[in-house]
Amino acid sequence: LPIGFCILLLQFDAPVPIAVLTSEPDRHYRIDQGAEMAEQQASASSIVLAEPSLLNLSGFEDALAKGWSPDPRRQQDNIYVEAELAALRYDRAGFLARFTSGDIVATSVSDRAPQRLVIRSFWIWDGEFCGYITFRHLPGTSQLPLHLPGHVGYSIVPWKQGRGYATQALRLLLPIAEQAGFERISVICNEANLASRRVIEKVGGVLYRTGADPSDDPDTIKLFFWLATLSGL
């Protein structure tokens, strides 16, 4: 582990333990288990990242029921939101698996066979569900399938926005990317999305390209940032 980091493992009797990642002023990196611990740490550190489980899926469900779209590209798409809510209620375990298992996809590297996408998804948690953040990558390469806009995806529910949660969550994700072997990751946002741009720049994002991305409408201009992990600083 890099200097300034430590790991603390705590055992709980919860039937399906969750991992909680939290940053503290001394920059320690701590992994706790259990939904109750998540709530305790949230009150002390503003937010934590909690691994999705059947124990905390109800927060995601409640957000969908309020009209939140987990896909930032499909805001105000009520048909999509209702379909997601119906899918969750029909098969909760199957819906949850979408956040923990990646599809087998073709890479953009011509000499590599199709690989399974690695997905690390977390709920953003302050004592209740605030949104999610995901780190996705292909083993052995920093390149991504064309349909994915960068290594990171996130969304904050509207009633939790404006509190700095996205910035904190992105910072908490960097040690996870570092553990996967990345010195830097690609983070993308719409040119018109000033809030997301501020989030990325606050965490140290460096703009390296502006233009369209195959993951979205060709008329939508994107900003492409490199974001260094601790090993890349």
Question: Each predicted region: which residue ranges?
Answer:
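Hydrophobic adenine-recognition pocket in adenosine-nucleotide-binding enzymes
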Residues: 156, 189
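Conserved active-site alpha-helix within GNAT-family acetyltransferase domains
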Residues: 192-209
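Conserved acetyl-CoA-binding loop-helix of GNAT-fold acetyltransferases
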Residues: 154, 162-175, 198-202
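Conserved GNAT acetyl-CoA-binding A-motif
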Residues: 179-188
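Loop/helix-junction capping segments adjacent to catalytic residues or to phosphate/diphosphate-binding pockets
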Residues: 57, 163, 194
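Short phosphate-binding/catalytic loops that engage adenosine nucleotides
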Residues: 165, 182, 205
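GNAT-family acyltransferases
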Residues: 4, 8-12, 17-151, 158, ...
